[in-house]
Design a protein with these regions (language model features):
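Thiamine diphosphate
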Residues: 1-133
C-alpha cells in the first residue's frame, strides 16, 4: 500500500471551505498560540508527518520535486511494507471554480460582516437549488 501524503501544514481543504463561509479557517493551520494575542497565529508547529509515519513502521520518502516524487513512487511499488510519500504543498493554492454548489450551511446570526455576507450568498444559492428526487 502506498500513501501519498500532501503536507499543507494543517487542514487546508476544510480551511478553504471555512474561509468561503466567512469563518476565517479557524484552527486549520498547525500553529502555536500567539502569547500577545491569544490567537492561533503564532509560529508554525513542528509537526513531522514523515517521522510519524516512520514510527508506525512505514517506509517514508520526502518528495519536493516531480523527479523525486517519480523516484519515490517507483521504489514504493516494490516495497512490501506500507509506504508513505510525503509531498509538501502550498496550502494557499486552490483549484479553480466549477459549475456546482456544495450546500454548506452558514450561521443565520453573526456579528461578523464576512459571515453575514456568506449567509446572503448561501440564501441566494439555496433559492437556485434543484431537487432531483
Amino acid at each position: 500500500m502506498t500513501i501519498v501524503l500532501l503536507d499543507n501544514r494543517g487542514f487546508a481543504s476544510i480551511g478553504g471551505l471555512s474561509e468561503a463561509v466567512g469563518s476565517g479557517g479557524f484552527g486549520t493551520r498547525y500553529q502555536y498560540r500567539n502569547a500577545a494575542t491569544s490567537e492561533l497565529d503564532g509560529d508554525a508547529l513542528p509537526v513531522d508527518l514523515a517521522a510519524n509515519a516512520a514510527s508506525l513502521g512505514a517506509r517514508v520518502w520526502r518528495a519536493d520535486t516531480l523527479a523525486s516524487f517519480r523516484e519515490a513512487l517507483a521504489e514504493a511499488r516494490s516495497e512490501v511494507r506500507p509506504s508513505v510519500i510525503v509531498v509538501p504543498v502550498d496550502r494557499e493554492a486552490r483549484v479553480g471554480g466549477y459549475d456546482s454548489w456544495w450546500d454548506v450551511p452558514v450561521p443565520e446570526v453573526s456579528t461578523r460582516r464576512e459571515v453575514q455576507a456568506a449567509r446572503e450568498a448561501y440564501d441566494a444559492a439555496r433559492r437556485m437549488e434543484r431537487d432531483f428526487l
